[in-house]
A protein has these predicted regions:
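Structured, contiguous alpha/beta core segments that scaffold functional sites
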Residues: 1-197
């Protein structure tokens, strides 16, 4: 077998810049959540599409998808012992809703549930909410819209109050956001620092 020989590079001339290559990488900015005049809700990022962007990342990359799905499956484990009890009219069980909530936490850093109160102040039904359809209100509560892209959906957003066990009427949104220092209105996923890679 022949020996492989390496040749040492010639001494670099500090005035010769012809061999310098500059690489610039796109920066994935951390979204800014701010109030906008004339709107009753807090925008979710500069263009109000940050949840859709996170969904795009999840669906676009096989590795990213596999890591997040695996993490969610690991957290869910075997589910609840009695988790096959229906929680709503559509037949979603506690385990079904829990799986969706866990995946939302892994992708977005939080989840939303619609709580439907019945007579006597008891919770009648629980539904998982598509995370991308809700925006936090400036005062309290949430705003629902099937799509926040005004080119697709011209409907006005619908106000839904935040969960309040002291006011058990109608439908309310229960919100869970993971804690992250410096965030006020919306959570950030734990992988936010790796979005540039």
């Amino acid at each position: 077998m022949d020996d492989i020989k390496f040749q040492a590079p010639a001494a670099l001339d500090k005035d010769d810049t012809s061999n310098i290559i500059v690489l610039k990488f796109a920066d994935s900015k951390i979204p800014v959540f701010r109030e906008t005049r004339g709107r009753d809700y807090i925008k979710y990022g500069d263009d109000n599409f940050y949840p859709e962007y996170l969904t795009y990342l999840y669906n676009k990359s096989g590795k990213h998808n596999a890591i997040l799905t695996g993490k969610a499956n690991y957290i869910f484990g075997g589910g609840f012992e009695n988790g096959n009890v229906a929680c709503n009219r559509t037949g979603d069980t506690l385990n079904d809703i829990s799986k969706k909530c866990i995946l939302d936490i892994v992708i977005y850093g939080g989840f939303r549930l619609e709580i439907v109160w019945g007579f006597g102040g008891k919770i009648n039904e629980v539904y998982h909410c598509d995370y991308s359809t809700l925006r936090r209100g400036k005062e309290c509560g949430f705003y629902f819209k099937e799509s926040w892209n005004d080119l697709i959906c011209k409907d006005k957003e619908e106000y839904i109050p935040a969960f309040d066990h002291l006011c058990p009427f109608g439908s309310q949104i229960f919100s869970y956001d993971e804690y992250r220092p410096g965030t006020r209105y919306y959570p950030l996923p734990d992988y936010i620092g790796s979005n540039n890679y």
